[in-house]
């Protein structure tokens, strides 16, 4: 899935270099590290994936009570209000092709394609996505990124 340099479309400010998936967003919020999120971008689908992750931990895994779940939801919504949100609309064929070629879910392929298209570094804590996407683009974990913001 090679692209010619002219096929990339740059979004936002020049200093926006990170595209966050839902796993990295939720993990950074849990750690109380939100500055990198405000400086980055994500896909519109990440909000609902993030909310789903909180719901799963609250309702199914019972890792915390409803008050904590609602607090996390409020913080996540605030974070999304501060982030630049982009859409994967228009990438459907690329997303499907990448998912089919690499065995990714459509959601994971959407993050990878959006990062490739816009020359962004993908931030994910999903090990399978990281392993596969790193063949095509730069990928880091939220912990790696957080350490850059602490220094």
Descriptions of predicted regions:
Residues 29-63, 67-68, 84-87:
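PIN/NYN-family metal-dependent endoribonuclease catalytic core
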Residues 1-17, 43, 49, 117, ...:
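Acidic, PIN/NYN-like endoribonuclease modules and their adjacent C-terminal/linker elements
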Residues 23-32, 125-129:
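Short, polar loop motifs at secondary-structure junctions
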Residues 4-7, 83-121, 125-128:
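Active-site neighborhoods of divalent-metal-dependent phosphate/nucleic-acid chemistry enzymes
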Residues 51-55, 77, 96:
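Amphipathic alpha-helical segments within well-ordered protein domains
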Residues 23, 48-52, 74:
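Internal, well-ordered alpha-helical scaffold/interface segments
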Residues 9-25, 78-83:
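An acidic intrinsically disordered interaction segment
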């Amino acid at each position: 899935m090679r692209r010619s340099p002219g096929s990339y479309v740059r979004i936002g400010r020049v200093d926006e270099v990170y595209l966050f998936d839902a796993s990295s967003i939720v993990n950074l919020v849990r750690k109380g590290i939100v500055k990198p999120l405000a400086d980055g971008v994500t896909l519109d689908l990440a909000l609902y994936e993030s909310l789903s992750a909180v719901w799963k931990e609250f309702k199914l895994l019972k890792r915390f009570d409803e008050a904590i779940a609602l607090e996390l939801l409020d913080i996540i919504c605030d974070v999304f209000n501060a982030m630049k949100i982009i859409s994967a609309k228009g990438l459907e064929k690329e997303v499907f092709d990448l998912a089919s070629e690499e065995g990714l879910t459509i959601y994971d392929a959407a993050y990878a394609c959006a990062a490739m298209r816009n020359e962004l570094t993908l931030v994910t804590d999903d090990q399978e996505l990281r392993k596969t996407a790193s063949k095509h683009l730069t990928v880091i974990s939220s912990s790696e990124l957080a350490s850059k913001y602490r220094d």
